[in-house]
Amino acid sequence: MVIDANIYWFDEKIFHDDAYAEQFLAEVPRLYQTEGKMEILPNGRKQVVIEKPFGYANVNYVEGDYILENILADMDQSGIDVGILKLPCYHEWLSLELCKKFNDGMADFAKRSGGRLRGLGVVPPRASQAVKDEIDRCLNTLGFTGLQMVAHYGDHYLDDEQFAEFFEYINELGLTVYIHHNPVPVEFNQLYEYNNVRRSYGRNVDQGTAIMRELFSGFFDKFPNIKFVHSMLGGGFFAFKNLILPKKATKAEDVQRFQTDNGDIARHLEKNLFFEMSHAQPWGKDQLEAAVKILGADHIIYGSSYPVRKEWLTAGPDFVRALDISDSDKDMILTENAKRLYRL
């Protein structure tokens, strides 16, 4: 079995139902310099464009990219047995009403796939009884086995105290939560002007910031039963792991500049944090092999970000198989880690 843990889903009905489209676009948080608009491509297809900041496109949802039969055909071509449906960025601002609508849509999509596609529930990060009821519905009625969130909401990362009561409930349930990157980090003023800097590096800065805050704020001391799976390999976290866990100096120093008592942080990295690659080919062979060596194959999950680029799905598994890592490592990345964390 091969599992693609990152197949994007957007409700195609939005392209054909004016009232639904209006409702979706009305919730885009313009107070946070975010804009959403419907456009027509030269070939006649519609697309929803999300800009952040205004005038700078960051996410595109294109009509026809989310057709079940096409997704299954592409999965067949690439040898993908099971895909996990993810919402690309827009759940940062969805109301509970729209979350319910998207949860119903994902559940129906998964049901019609004959078990090939699975969903993760989405809710606003609030501790109201209505939100808890929707989480329970996702798990007990819709058949979802985890939740999906974004790295920050508004100007606040997930370690912010305003989310604590929400995570208390998630901790009680012992859930795996997939953490998708936002289009740009909270502080993006020097990142937005250039397209590749914004769309690639900006997302990694967002994830890296989120993980550092989760680790050093004591988040997992408070919520030890939660497992987070961060996209984009946690913003290339493998490059920084050793830097944030410095060893004690070999000789006595008058000034101690770094925290070296990092046992709890290392423990949370082992138990609570996992990394989905989002796509294999863009990272490259050397980077993925380094990530496996540093983070451990048991902490890395394969995903393709389909349909951003079709080839990331159709050629992604073979790219992982060609890495200079053990067969057991490849099996963990392509299958076993997702199966375990998402209870497939």
Predicted segment positions?
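Helix-coil boundary/capping segments in enzymes
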Residues: 1-344
